[in-house]
Amino acid sequence: MSLNPRDVVVVDCVRTPMGRAKNGCFRNVRAETLSAALIEALFERNPKLDPKEVEDVIWGCVNQTKEQGFNVARQISLLTRIPHESAAQTVNRLCGSAMSAIHTAAQAIQTGNGDVFLVGGVEHMGHVPMTEGFDHNPAASKYSAKASNMMGLTAEMLAKMHGITREQQDEFGARSHRLAHEATQEGRFKNEIVPIEGHDENGFVKLIEEDETIRPETTAESLGQLRPAFDPKNGTVTAGTSSQLTDGASAMVLMSAERAEALGLTPIAKIRSMAVAGCDPAIMGYGPVPATKKALKRAGLKVEDIDFWELNEAFAGQSLPVLKDLKLLGVMEEKVNLNGGAIALGHPLGCSGARISTTLLNIMQAKGGKLGVSTMCIGLGQGIATVWERI
């Protein structure tokens, strides 16, 4: 493949293991510490990458308060070998924050405003709960349903509109855990996971090397025993078919193709196109459909051209309508979330965009796929998507 000088390439990408938000393995580890460990690991894994080359550290984070406040990207950068002369910014597009960090860096590279960027995201949902400090504007109810702020109810709405049954959701949830467990057992996550020191259930320091969130014993039958979590009387969405609340971080090295060549670094993929789109907040989970269609059009591609997909599993009742309308249900077992998804691994809000992209790129490398798409829904009615091409 011939690369243009300003093509945006990925040199390396990593993530932490995913820890449960409630009394999990990272209950005594801060968000900045998780992120800084990934940046240090990227420098260790890529000795030709000079910290002085970094133009900007761009980090996604949703709830920017407490340890995640006051420009957490800069707080993270100051914990690493990156010099003070390099800049840092925190971005927030709710669930799409880390993917927006990728897009922000990519746009800078494409326009000649920098060559080397460290991007990623973090959310410590154990230390900073999802709605910590949020004050909803009552006037917003004139323009969108108040229930649009309750993600589980938006999933209920989307599932009902598309005729998605409780049984289909339970099957999808069980699939996520089964595939994530298989990926762990077969070592498919090893290249992307950076082991991080945490604590076991007894409080002893332990090197965390695998995701804490996967429940291999999960079946559709066991999920079928759970009560609806958001609409107790008529609902179909349960805690078992929703993304888990977790603590985690993800990180990538993005740079221009010409700078990667000059530094002697071998890129693993390039960005073909990017897109964001909006939708009705009441069905916020539908956002990946318009965003993906827009990104594919910009790349001159069709759905059937894509070898592998990573769709953030906010809810099974949200994922299945998206796959249905993208005409992917028939090829799901061959192409979609082959190592499980957020139902098994969790969805640390500001982290997930780079996490699913990291997992996708590792799948593409392992299986030899040429083209991949990572896409996700975003609270209050948005979607974001990235088209990747393996090098």
Swiss-Prot record:
Keyword field contains Cytoplasm: yes
Q: Which pathway does this polypeptide act in? A: Lipid metabolism; fatty acid beta-oxidation
Per UniProt, the enzyme's principal EC class comes to transferase
Enzyme Commission number(s) of this protein: 2.3.1.16
Q: Which GO terms describe its biological process?
A: fatty acid beta-oxidation; phenylacetate catabolic process
Catalytic reaction equation(s): an acyl-CoA + acetyl-CoA = a 3-oxoacyl-CoA + CoA
Q: Keyword NADP: yes or no?
A: no
- Give the subcellular location: Cytoplasm
- Alphabetized PROSITE patterns for the sequence: THIOLASE_1 (PS00098), THIOLASE_2 (PS00737), THIOLASE_3 (PS00099)
InterPro entries this protein is in? FadA, Thiolase, Thiolase-like, Thiolase-like_sf_Thiolase, Thiolase_acyl_enz_int_AS, Thiolase_AS, Thiolase_C, Thiolase_CS
Pfam families listed in its UniProt record: Thiolase_C, Thiolase_N
Per the Swiss-Prot or TrEMBL record, the active site comprises C95 (acyl-thioester intermediate), H347 (proton acceptor), C377 (proton acceptor)
Q: Which domain of life is it from?
A: Bacteria
A GO CC term? cytoplasm
User: What keywords would UniProt list here?
Assistant: Acyltransferase, Cytoplasm, Fatty acid metabolism, Lipid degradation, Lipid metabolism, Transferase
Question: What does this protein do, in the record's words?
Answer: Catalyzes the final step of fatty acid oxidation in which acetyl-CoA is released and the CoA ester of a fatty acid two carbons shorter is formed.
In the record, the note on similarity to other proteins reads: Belongs to the thiolase-like superfamily. Thiolase family.
Complex and partners: Heterotetramer of two alpha chains (FadB) and two beta chains (FadA).
Protein known as:
3-ketoacyl-CoA thiolase
